[in-house]
Amino acid sequence: MADDLDGDIRRLADLLAGSERCVAMTGVRLGATEDTEAAAAGSAWGEFASLEVLLTEPARFWENWLPRAIEASEREVTPAHRALARLEGAGVIHAIITQAVDHLHARAGDGDLIEVHANVLSCRCARCDDVYALSEVQGLIDAADDGVPRCTREGCGYPLRPTGTLWGEPLVEEAIIRAWDMAAWCDLFLVLDTQLRTDPMAMLPSVPLKRGGKVAI
């Protein structure tokens, strides 16, 4: 088993050394410590973190979503995040596409980061787009009679929503377009810590393959 692992590591090192345009894709659990990842990532969050629940049972949505969003925002950068950031800093990796919502890649120092689900670090007004930190949202929930945070801008008062995507919503269009462009551009596509179960991201590794690139999973 150790010999097989050593051989895989050597082959990956050779692929990286021979690549001029490497792009990495990471899954939702690279920085997770438990099953508390974002709705769009296909985890237990999908039971309540959906657009439908937000619209029909907003108090239940916020009761369940906000503690998990806070947990995700407080996660520590892992050695895997640091290693990828160092590879990007050294020019070995040129961009990172991630399904994660904890923003840990950015905190690790990744410069060219594509977050296809955005992240859970903030919420926004669904009408005027004012942005609120999670701590502010908690205060608004505590002060609300119905447990629903609302915009504090004078004359607005519209309910807030997470900045990131929810079940039942399309992914961030600009990020998806850029992810496809980078997958088509690269000559080596690394797939890390994702089971490739959710479309359209599950189809992304096929893009470089069709253009003669290599994929390492």
Could you tell me what each predicted segment is?
Residues M1-I217:
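Conserved catalytic core of sirtuin-type NAD+-dependent deacylases
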